[in-house]
Amino acid sequence: MSTLLASMKAVPKAVSNLARYAIPAIVLTGTAFLMLDNFSYTLFGIASHSASTFAFQAYYWIIIFLFFIYFIDKLAKANSTDGVIGKYCGSLLKLMLILLGLSSVSLVVSYNQPLSTELGVSTAAVSATPLRDKLPNIIFLGADGVNSSNMSIYGYQRVTTPFMDSIAHESLIYRNHWTNSSKTTGSIGALLTGKYPTRTKVIFRPDTFKGEDMFQHLPGILRGLGYYNIDITLRHYIDSEDLKMRNAFDYANHRQLNQQGSQLKHFFLLRWPTMVQFIEENGLRLYQRLAHLSGYTSMVNPRKQIHQGADAAPHLSDIGRIKQLKEQILQAPKPFFANVHLLGPHGSKFDYQEAIFTETKQQDEHWMVDHYDNAIYQWDAYSREIYQLLDELGELDNTLLVFSSDHGKGHSVNETLPLIIRYPNKEHTGTITQASQRVDIAPTVLSYLGVTPPQWMDGHSLLSRGNDFYPIFIVTSSMQQLTNAGDWKVAANLKPPFYSLGTISMAYCGILYSMDINDIHQPLLSQQRVHPKAATCPDVDLEPMLAYGMIVTHLKEMGYNTDQLNVELRLRQYSVRTE
């Protein structure tokens, strides 16, 4: 009886402790859980993301609950009369004041001048521009890893793009279009910002946009014009939120986004962006694990999602992406901007619905050309579906359609890419042979809308460009990855001063000059003729050392420390070979 009475008396005390210490206990529990999860995975390969059964998930919830009870108990005891806080209240108060002082000093030291969110364009009167009655919808419908040489609209012997062939006469087709990054992350970043990846330092994950680059992008300008922005791509690698693009999209990959946020968060973001991103990233990791353990949503391995092809869940496949796009076309406020990226042609095995150039969909080897062509045919078929839907809705001639790819097959940078733009009412048609690049697309769209592209964009409007030629800079990642997609293992060796930047190439007058800037022992400068020289180019090709100097100058202008790339130093210490 006495035991029962004691237990009953303890209940109010436990409730009181819970009310008093719940918040710090939750913070400590979340921190301890993340540390334990990372530790157990590093040592034993066991972590919460692999909990696929109810029993396994319950095991983790028990651990979390025990952590929470433990911290409640320890906090209550420490705060009791004979606890640590009770005994050493004065000393602890002094210690707390010292720690607060040090924290304040840290905040002052890490303080940045508030980031500017100005976009450098005047959008107030654009909707009333005399160029057109109303702003058009804009759809970027891209596919991963497509060489233009495998598309019949570019002269390929197989009819891989029958739909695009049929609208060639009402489109503007660019014959010498180049990527700015061999990685999708950097290429999509270049597409949406009009900035070189060397400027934003966004080449491959874990790179994210930082500083004013977080706010300076095409979607932000379009939102200022009243566009509703839609991002249908891939989480982790090219999702706008995951890349820390701010004020960019209203909808991204199955979720509505709150671009306003709290004023307090915005205040800290502009002044302590690194701290805010650190808190956001850890909060996201904790949320993903808890959502997975609760069965609300499964943690999806981003690398496995890319490579699983036909095995992808419907909502994570290209079928799901096209379904999302159709739903948004029907439901989204007008005008809208949609950035869509399909993965069917990514490889090394390809995803598509119908075997056109093969007997079956069975792929016994990697990078099989016939199946690659099937995937390109599928992209063309999806493009037809969107075109027809817009036509049925009466929106076709009020929509700017851009068909493009992020990089060449197998992440190659020495292949031209498709760029096909279908303007409303067929305003611009024909074929352009002048070289163009991914960073040119954003300023081209703005020029069409009547907006002068901001100075921070590296690209040029293709609508107002003459016959001049200029160097195109292309990057690859330095990551030497050891990856097991099923076990979430990725190892990367990132070193200063170039970090995720590996090889940099310069396409100039039909020649691609390339060098691995991290090979400090013997940097290799190679050159390759990649397309015929334009008539406006000089008769004599660049000398290798001049090309080398142009690449180094570009890196220096982009803010890199190029001391170890000094041409004279290289000539003295190493050999620079031209192949």
Walk through the language-model features, giving the residues of each.
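Membrane-interface soluble catalytic domains
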Residues: 1-26, 30-45, 49, 57, ...
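A long, amphipathic alpha-helix that forms part
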Residues: 89-95, 103-134, 316-336, 356-399, ...
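His/Cys-centered metal/cofactor-coordination and adjacent catalytic loops
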Residues: 130-136, 147-264
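Loop/turn elements at helix/coil->beta-strand transitions in domains of secreted/extracellular proteins
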Residues: 134-138, 170-175, 223-230, 332-338, ...
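Short beta-strand segments
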Residues: 142, 178, 231-233, 336-344, ...
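Metal-dependent active-site segment of extracytoplasmic phospho-/sulfohydrolases and closely related
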Residues: 148, 163, 374-426, 442-452, ...
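Formylglycine-dependent
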Residues: 242-330
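Active-site His/acidic residue clusters
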Residues: 292-308, 323-374, 378, 410-418, ...
